[in-house]
Curated annotation (Swiss-Prot):
Catalysed reaction equations from the record: [protein]-peptidylproline (omega=180) = [protein]-peptidylproline (omega=0)
UniProt superkingdom: Eukaryota
Ranges in a coiled coil: none
Protein name (record): Peptidyl-prolyl cis-trans isomerase D
Taxonomic lineage from the root: Eukaryota, Fungi, Dikarya, Ascomycota, Saccharomycotina
Location relative to the cell: Cytoplasm
One Pfam match: Pro_isomerase
Amino acid sequence: MTERQKTYFDLSIGGKPAGRVVFEVYSDVTPKTAENFVRLCAGDAGECRTKPGVPLCYQGSLFHRVIKGFMCQFGDFTNGDGTGGESIYGEKFEDENFARKHDRPFLLSMANAGPNTNGSQCFITCAPTPHLDGKHVVFGEVIQGKRVVRAIERQETAADRPLADVRIDACGILPASYEVPADAEATPADEYGDDYEETLADDAKVDLADPRSVIRAVEAVKAIGTAQLQAARFDVAVQKYAKAAGFLQEYFPDDLPDADVAALEQLKVAVHLNLALAALKAGNHQRVLSAASEVLHGAADDKAKAKALYRRGLAYHHLKDPEMALTDLELAATYQPGDAGIAQAIVNARALKQKLREQQKKALSKMFS
């Protein structure tokens, strides 16, 4: 059996080292396509025919196209914008086969401009992409550095191009004896004690088949958010609550027992209430609106609805929208009659409404005086 070769990219994002990604290519399934990639990593295939003087090598080139939830594309070392690149066999070569499917994230596949137009451009899948089956040749996978791929996937983009350069600083072939370290994909805890990946599916600690494992992950990150809220690190609290909320959004299989659905729904309400509170204290009023709205669209009881409406009403007040603030606050009062905080917020919103009305009158009188 043909031994599968391993190659690596050492990457930087915005000029800062981002880590190493290690690939295993399917030399036994797609030998010609795999050999093209390996030689372009090694940089030992000479110069481009289309651009003499430019090495046939990925080193120094960029990830020029990134679409979250889809793929990260690279390999245009001649033009840098997706219009160039070249294979070791010439400008283009044929589709070898479509034996492997795009059935999971972290697969390595050839980019092309149609049938039999493979060059040097490739992409890493960020999710299953079955619509590409039969059109693009899957020839390898990421076996180390999945967190680095996710970091690339999360980059802010304009027209799908990362705003910060994602560069292949170095690349090459690893020895046949190379083995991925046992702890290579372990998530290091951050300074707040959070050792969970940004995506549940990427975290080896979480068993997606067990709702209790998911709940433990959400509660752990939520607890970190609460600790940061109590320490008045409001921006960090927002980040952690948002991460916990993202876990819940990511996970909700159709076949869960009713008891597990109820537990997850209640946890979702609690996380979004806390997110709204932390965002309010951080001055992130748009985030308050979205988090509070999630509570109101969920399985919230009257007490939770009152809190969500109160926090959303305060956010509208800060956004100088007293009409919306009063709508929320007056409805909150029906769920929590006699609450002094809600009552005072209503008084404040009415005062803001009057103040803005008087300012408008003055502005109009100046226009017509």
